[in-house]
Amino acid sequence: MTSVLSSTPTSIPIIAGAQEALRDTLQQPTSVQYVPAAATSSLSDNVQLQSSNDSTINGVVIGLLSSFGSAILIALIFLIVYFFKYTSSGRILLDRIGRPGEYDDEQAFAKEEAEALEEMDDLQRTEYLRAKAFVQSNPPDSLPTDISLSQYLAIQEKGVSAWEFEPELEIANCFVEARTEIEFFDSECCTLTNLPVPKQNEVYYWESKIYDKPENTLISIGVATKPYPLFRLPGWHKYSVAYTSTGHRRYNQPFSGPVYGPQYVQGDVIGVGYRPRTGTIFFTRNGKKLEDVAHGLKSQNLFPAVGANGPCTVHVNFGQSGFVFIEANVKKWGLAPMTGSLAPPPPYGSEQGSILLEAGRESAQSSNGYYQPDPRHGRTRSGNFRHGPPTSPGPLRSPTDISLAQLTHIPSHEEPGEASNSSTPAPTGNTTTQPGLSVHDNAQPPPEYTSPLPSEAGSPRGSTDGERTPMLRRKTTPPPIPSYNDAVAQRNRSNSHRDQVGSRRERSDSHQARHGDGSPSRS
């Protein structure tokens, strides 16, 4: 290479230029490699800040677009539902979007009615049309069925005993005994209570026990409104709900009913529950709760109803005894308390002027101030004389005193002008009678009389818990009553003794008179 350079001197500038170019080329990466550290860090921060700002803006934009998109989607769905629900005639969208819907209740009922009438015989068709005409002419709750004031007071006084079943006398196919024991016979009918189910509490509940049920008898237990065709079963017409013995549920129609629960037979207990706030009806069977059967029955007054199409016996418990359903027993879901809260009427007493009790009082006094004994039990000491008028003229009264006492005439033997307080004159005859005693003739004796036994009912000795009750009682026998002959003989002896005393008094008076006349001559 040296030889080449030396041999060609004209190529020296060209080689020098190439060397300078090569030197610049080799020095260029060195200048990039030694960039200062401060410049490098500032450049990286700018790049990172720019990338973070871009990501924040992108997140905000995405969030706004998603929210607006969700709102637009919800509004679009709402418009579609509103359009199909309120603009399609004859169809109602019931559940999912895209389902074609079902006919409303009236159209479905008309369709079921037309199909059922074709399958009915003449008697069933006649009974159904008769009940339909009754419901159309007597809509539910067309009569006032709210609890009146008198019924409310009866509930307060009697408690749950105020409810009772009222059978239709014109049908005469069921008999009610002891208010809640129902016996059905050979044709179809039902019976409702006289009072509706209250609405004050949270839940009301009642049970029915099947005492007697043949296999071919259909029983329907539930609630219904008044007026209701009593020649039909509950659940067959508006508004009524029932649980039948075949295990089906009946709600306002007799054509077809879905299977609701197990069948019930003789010995089973069927309960009916009502929630007034939500209008929900549910049933129980032998203490086990079944699912709800109806909702929204809040405005109607519902009456417990029991019906059957054949012979059977059903006993209803409104709360007068314990329930089989334990929850109803604990929470006291009966229609009313077992006993009433009002006190019974006040008892009649002697202080209230009770005529019934005054008639039996032994110490009754008459208005004239003396005792008037009952003529059926009146007797004297001898037992052979009847009571006469009083022997005493009574207390002295002034001439201006007005009294309603009986006036008794007393014969007087005093001479005119003598004082009323003079001594009683001596008897003038031998036939002196005692005042107040009427003597019978010996030839016509009165009938034998037996006095009643003495009673201590009105005395303190007759009571058993009084303070004056004697600790030891002695039975005293009444004295014997003499016969009529003994009484006549005793009266004759008393009359003869009185005559002897009178004759002695007369002799003594005459003797004193003779001695009194001769005394002046001796003086």
Curated annotation (Swiss-Prot):
Residues 361-400, 412-523 are annotated as: Disordered. Pfam families: SPRY. The keyword Protein transport applies. One of its GO terms (cellular component) is vacuolar membrane. The chain crosses the membrane at residues 60-80. Keywords: Endosome, Glycoprotein, Membrane, Protein transport, Signal-anchor, Transmembrane, Transmembrane helix, Transport, Vacuole. It is found in: Vacuole membrane; Endosome membrane. Residues 1-59 are cytoplasmic. Components of the endosome-vacuole trafficking pathway that regulates nutrient transport. May be involved in processes which determine whether plasma membrane proteins are degraded or routed to the plasma membrane. This is Protein ssh4.
